[in-house]
Amino acid sequence: MNTYTETEKEQALGVIESVVGRCEKVWPKFAEGTSQQSLLKNRIKALYIAKALISGEEKRDGYGKEELQQALAPIESIISKCEKARLKFEDGSTHYVRFSKMIEAMDIAKAFLEDEINKR
C-alpha cells in the first residue's frame, strides 16, 4: 500500500502531465512504424496508466494485469535515463532539480503500478 501524501501525488501528476504533453508534442515528428514512435507510444500509454492509478480514476480498473506489467518498462526507462542525466549536473542546479522531480514522480508511478499488479 502506498503512503504518499496528497501533495506528493499532486506533484507527481503535474510532472506526468508535463511529460505526456512533451511526448505528444514530438509524436508527429517520428515516421510511422519507426522504433522511436513505438517507444514513444508505449511511454505515453504507460504514463496515462500511471496517471489513472495515482489520481484514482475509475478507468484504472479497465487495465489488465498484462497492460500494467508492460507499463513498468517505460517508467523504469524514464527513471534510469533521468538518473544518468542528473549525474551530469551539480546538485541544486536547475537541471538537477528537474531530473530529481521527474525521478520522484516516476518512482511514485512505479510504486502505484507495482501495487496494482500485486492486487491482481
Where are the predicted features?
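Terminal, compositionally biased segments
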Residues: 1-8, 114-120
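Short, charged, amphipathic alpha-helical segments
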Residues: 35-45, 69, 94-104
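Low-complexity, intrinsically disordered tandem-repeat tracts enriched in small residues
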Residues: 12, 26, 33, 50-52, ...
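Charged, low-complexity interaction regions
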Residues: 25-38, 59-63, 84-97, 118
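Short amphipathic alpha-helical heptad-repeat segments
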Residues: 7-24, 43, 67-83
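Amphipathic alpha-helical coiled-coil segments
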Residues: 46-62, 85-88, 105-120
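Polar/charged low-complexity regions in secreted precursors and cytosolic/nuclear IDRs
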Residues: 5-8, 17, 24, 31-33, ...
